[in-house]
Amino acid sequence: MTKLNELAPAPGSTKGRMRVGRGPGSGKGKTAGRGVKGQKARSGVAIAGFEGGQMPLHMRMPKRGFNNPFRLEFAEVNLWRLEQAVEAGKLKAGADVSVADLVAAGVIRRELDGVKLLGKGEIKSALKLTVYSATEAAIKAVEAAGGSVTVTKKAKVQAEA
């Protein structure tokens, strides 16, 4: 059986890299295959999106949408991730679990504007969770496992206002 470290291109199927601009004897000296003068002969080649004076495509298309400065971004946590943390001993079954506990356990990197509990996967451990938002499926699954979910509904940014 062929090993990955033994793979090689077929003999004669590849060429070596051509070093350009190294004298007339090389066949690729002086202008190094770039022709004579002009923008394309210079380093950096073309200006991205420039179409020779024609209105570029990105400017012909209409503007669309906007960036909402008040948009809230939630750290999402799935049920399987919580169960994984319990099995690894990072969270205790039956304990109260806050957002700070999730960060400390490495379940989420940081809080962002809040934590949203999602229902992907299964949870067998009873946890008393306090989150900013949760899906119906996630709440039902946690309660079926003997735990509870407290939804505060006020994200960090909204609470400050």
Swiss-Prot record:
Gene Ontology CC: cytosolic large ribosomal subunit
GO biological process: translation
Domain of life, source organism: Bacteria
Family per record: Belongs to the universal ribosomal protein uL15 family.
Biased composition (Gly residues): 22-36
Gene that specifies this protein: rplO
Known role: Binds to the 23S rRNA.
Keywords from the named record: Ribonucleoprotein, Ribosomal protein, RNA-binding, rRNA-binding
Record's subunit section: Part of the 50S ribosomal subunit.
Organism of derivation: Caulobacter sp. (strain K31)
HAMAP family: Ribosomal_uL15
Molecular function (Gene Ontology), one example: rRNA binding
Residue ranges of the region described as Disordered: 1-41
NCBIfam families cross-referenced by the UniProt entry: rplO_bact
Name this polypeptide is given: Large ribosomal subunit protein uL15
Cited Pfam families: Ribosomal_L27A
